[in-house]
Amino acid sequence: MSTLALVLSLALQASPPAKPLPKPAAQAAPRKAPAEDVAAATQAWHAERLQRLTSPDGWLTLVGLTWLKEGEQTAGSAPGSAVVLPAPAPSRAGTFVRKGDSVSFQPAPGAAFTLEGKPFTGGALKTDEKGAPDVLRLGSVNFQVIRRQERLGVRVKDSEAAARKQFHGIPLYPASADWKVEARLVPDEKPRMLSVPTVLGYSEEMKSAGTLVFTVAGKEYRLMPVAEDGSDELFIIFGDETNRDATYGAGRFLEAPLPDKDGRVVLDFNRAYNPPCAFTRFATCPLPPRGNRLAVRVEAGEKRAGDH
């Protein structure tokens, strides 16, 4: 090898390797959340859901509902009471008096009811029509007055109810990122009310929030949510083809965040849950409105826990 060739060879060996040219930046493709993230989030959500359901005032404690007639009606654990209270409530606990749209309650002597932690000696009761109702408590039993159209009823709960004590959980479909979909909220051209049927046989008028348009397995579907006053979420009452054999027959509930500035809403069907009527025959549940029964099996969220 000549002297010049040797020098060039040594110089090339001593030089650092050339850095590769940077690749042009690629536009990031949209990705679904990893399945394990969806599973963990669903598990955390469901733990909170079960905590609320099994709380001392949860739906598992609902043991009675009596619609009041005009005039006086007795309340107590004695057979023949107009408003039946579970033992260990006194056989004669007091008297309800309905006068038109107002209801009062007079405790019987020795029945130590409380209202907001203070002794209640009698008087008018606030219903659930506009905000939180008055809740009277006596031991493990509590009751409140609810209004449903022209009906006024006494809703009775018992924290020692068998349904609460014997509760063993609710089966879930395996969480899947495929059921966390992005929807587009199409607003109504003008404000309108949605006719929502109920298990009581009449329909309630609820404020429409528009129409959610989304795609599952390449097919477009639509759902109509309702907008509850003061809520930061959309409320959806829907049915699907799993109601026939795997989920609660009357449909399920789903909540979703309000749309972003572009009208996008994330629908996480992994969080679809059973209405109170799946656990007690004394609830007054809304049912899916016309158009909210999907012609697809939504195999996500809670499965059937028992019909009533």
Task: Enumerate the predicted regions with their spans.
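Forkhead-associated
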Residues: 62, 67-133
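An exposed acidic His-Trp-rich patch
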Residues: 117-130, 220-271
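N-terminal pre-domain segments of enzymes
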Residues: 16-66
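Short strand-coil-strand connectors
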Residues: 116, 137-139, 157, 215-219, ...
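Sec-dependent N-terminal signal peptides
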Residues: 1-14
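Surface-exposed beta-loop interaction hotspot
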Residues: 139-204
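Mid-length scaffold segments of soluble, non-membrane domains
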Residues: 88-90, 95-104, 203-247
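Extended, aromatic/histidine-rich regions of cofactor-dependent oxidoreductases associated
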Residues: 241-245, 255-259, 264-266, 270-308
